[in-house]
Amino acid sequence: SKILMPGLRMGLMVVPTELVERTVVSKHNSDISTSPLIQKSLYYYMSKFNWDKHSSDMEKIYTDKFLETYKYINKKLGGRLTIVKNKGGINFFLGLNRGFSSRNFVNFMYNKKVALQPGYIYYDLDIEDRFFRINISMETMDRIKEAIDIISDSLDEFYALSRIEAKGL
């Protein structure tokens, strides 16, 4: 979908807070199957246009974006967060210090206008809830860098608030 029709979305969901996690998992599961609309669009595109050129152009765009983001993440967050080696895709998994929750961090960052996803929804096994995901497919490089800057500027505040909450103050 990122190569053929990046950003194709149909509809809007307003979900009660208590259902957000289940909804994200559900949406992720539905996204991994290919709808007839996408299949027909791909057939049309391949038969009417130069698919090879389009595919090559998209690969270059996303590779350049990925590499620039990778460098920026390492510059701003390297040594402060665990950066998981990417094994494909155009997203990044980062880990908070041990003992801190990505679910809490995702909510904390959402209030700062940065949308992240908790990493646990991408794993089959229970793991430490400290990893989160950054997806770069739809954002501009300026917005990606802005979001990384906000994450960098907010880490110490998040850690401090989490410690206070853990002490029950």
Q: Where are each of the predicted segments found?
A:
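Conserved core segment of the aminotransferase class I/II
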Residues: 1-60
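Residue-level recognition of strand-loop junctions within catalytic nucleotide-signaling folds
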Residues: 16-17, 47, 95-97, 137-139
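Conserved glycine-rich beta-strand-loop-beta hairpin in the small C-terminal domain of fold type I
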Residues: 43, 56-70, 82-95, 105-108
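Short, conserved charged micro-motifs
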Residues: 100-105, 142-146
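PLP-dependent enzyme catalytic core of the Aspartate aminotransferase-like
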Residues: 111-112, 125-169
